[in-house]
């Protein structure tokens, strides 16, 4: 059996790692998550699958996959992309989230590549008619993502509406808003438990800044909201508009300051949620041809 190391920094939320382990493991391949290891002996592995990041030096002579699940963020994001393009070592295979990500990195070589968009775990495909909260937000809670705009709205204008916040907020954010009775912070929740909690809300908030690179990338949480059949309130940006059109879904759009977020308008809005079972992880991974790509890498290296 060949051992494949799924190597990440441990900082990012990467549901795709569990999907790879669940759907790509077989009698020939064992996938190991680096986040579950204390120390790593790279010599134990037959293939290194890296979630990028930077990778300037090749330290072991085994095949390497570079996965670019997102573009660089923060200050000088495009410059960071350029540095990665120029200085990252050349892998045997690259995986890109979508065409937008591939185009922005603009690697000028003939390394094989595949696209692997985000999928949704089976556990999110539930419908819960017992609603205990008005709104839910799942995901990153940072100043950079502008999450305080949402919290300010519910602390003041929407203080009669309950808001369930699933995830780990930055300490200063939690310290400021924990006193508001209508804002409920769950803290970090096990991934498989999220749908049971989140589905108790009537509306789900997808709050993505309309700025590079966030507006080009797939919103994992929005996909999970759709799978749970929640009524979705979202900011207006490139990717979400393309997805809405492609799937024939209808979301309630808000601006960054949430001025359009009014309960009376939501009650009158004709939400349209459709089936996205074609975006289950097993279906997404079938489309990528990843299994055959891995087989070919291993075959070339070890036969």
Give residue ranges: language-model regions.
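Nucleotide-sugar-dependent
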Residues: 142-145, 192, 206-224, 234-244
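Donor nucleotide-sugar binding/catalytic pocket of nucleotide-sugar-dependent glycosyltransferases
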Residues: 92-125
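N-terminal pre-catalytic "stem/leader" segment of glycosyltransferase-like enzymes
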Residues: 1-52, 251, 299-303
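Membrane-proximal helix-turn-helix segments that form the acceptor-binding/catalytic region
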Residues: 75-96
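Active-site proximal beta-strand in glycosyltransferases
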Residues: 49, 57-75
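A charged, aromatic-enriched C-terminal amphipathic alpha-helix characteristic of glycosyltransferases
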Residues: 15, 123, 253-303
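Conserved catalytic-core segment of nucleotide-activated headgroup transferases in glycan assembly
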Residues: 9-20, 119-123, 130-176, 185-196
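A short alpha->beta transition loop at the rim of the catalytic pocket in nucleotide-sugar-dependent
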Residues: 202, 229-230, 236
């Amino acid at each position: 059996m060949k051992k494949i190391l799924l190597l990440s920094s441990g900082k990012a939320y990467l549901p795709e790692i569990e999907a790879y382990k669940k759907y790509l493991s077989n009698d020939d391949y064992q996938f190991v998550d680096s986040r579950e290891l204390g120390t790593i002996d790279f010599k134990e592995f037959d293939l290194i699958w890296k979630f990028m990041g930077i990778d300037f030096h090749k330290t072991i002579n085994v095949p390497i996959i570079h996965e670019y699940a997102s573009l660089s963020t923060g200050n000088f994001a495009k410059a960071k992309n350029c540095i990665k393009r120029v200085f990252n070592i050349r892998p045997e295979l690259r995986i890109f989230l979508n065409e937008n990500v591939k185009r922005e990195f603009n690697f000028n070589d003939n390394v094989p590549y595949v696209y692997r968009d985000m999928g949704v775990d089976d556990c999110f495909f539930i419908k819960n008619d017992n609603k205990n909260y008005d709104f839910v937000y799942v995901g990153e809670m940072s100043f950079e993502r502008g999450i305080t705009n949402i919290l300010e709205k519910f602390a003041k204008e929407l203080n009669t509406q309950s808001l369930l916040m699933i995830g780990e907020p930055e300490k200063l954010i939690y310290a400021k808003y924990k006193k508001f009775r209508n804002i409920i912070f769950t803290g970090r929740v096990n991934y498989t438990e999220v749908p049971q909690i989140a589905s108790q809300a009537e509306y789900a908030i997808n709050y993505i800044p309309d700025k590079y690179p966030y507006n080009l990338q797939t919103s994992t949480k929005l996909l999970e909201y759709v799978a749970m059949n929640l009524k979705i309130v979202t900011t207006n940006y490139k990717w979400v508009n393309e997805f809405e059109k492609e799937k024939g879904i209808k979301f309630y759009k808000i601006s960054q300051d949430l001025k359009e977020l009014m309960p009376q308008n939501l009650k009158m809005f004709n939400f349209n949620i459709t089936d996205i079972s074609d975006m289950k992880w097993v279906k997404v991974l079938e489309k990528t041809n990843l299994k055959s790509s891995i087989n070919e890498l291993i075959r070339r290296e070890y036969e």
